[in-house]
């Protein structure tokens, strides 16, 4: 197997594109693909300031590295969730992220949630009805809220997350199987800024998980291999397995599934998007001033105030 570009021995074969690359040309291909997606969806420019959500894992560190190599002004934000019960997931991922930023001279903001709000994510979740077994919904809520708040406070032009094609396709699969029209109206790789919400972009939305892992390994990025202990047995992982079976049978399936959805969304298949955004802007949290659907406090303030 030879590299498509230089005839050297290939180190990776991209079945869905039917091409193979050597290390150097694969790393270059990843940067070109990412830049293409940024341009295609008019995500952001080199003059704008970006806040990248980093977890210490392969996707976020690969994306941060690529944005840096492409010349974007990308700072990192690491949220320490305080998940250290079964393994040292949070402490270790904080260390991988810190070292990555230090080696490249990149600006990293870290927030320790327990130090800031008095409780770790599992402790906060344990006080809620459903969160005592799995803290994922509270974790998602806190991460979304703080990422947005810190981006607005820091006057960043956009939030960048490393959701890859496997993540997006699995989320889409869940939304389609439940016909969650509200979510289906919002799963665009670029969400423009609205009152109280920063712009959000997903430049890896067309990059397979396998490709971002290969990028991290081949470019020598040290990332955390262990997953969060709470991700075990999640619906998202189960849906990824189903989609992997489809992809094995039919290389390129995930790309077709996701790009087909984006075409339908653009054609106006899910008009709920505007309606729910308008509803949200009517009310404000009494404590933090963020738009909220409920009266009084927003869901974040209710969770941390208990
Ligand atoms: S970090 Fe948080 Fe995930 Fe862990 S507790 Fe669940 S949501 S699984 S991306
Ligand atoms: Zn080559
Ligand atoms: Zn609030």
Language-model features: where?
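ATP-dependent adenylation/nucleotidyltransferase module used to activate substrates
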Residues: 2-185, 194-197, 209-219, 285, ...
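Flexible helical/loop "lid" subdomain adjacent to adenine-nucleotide binding pockets
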Residues: 39, 166-170, 174-204, 209-212, ...
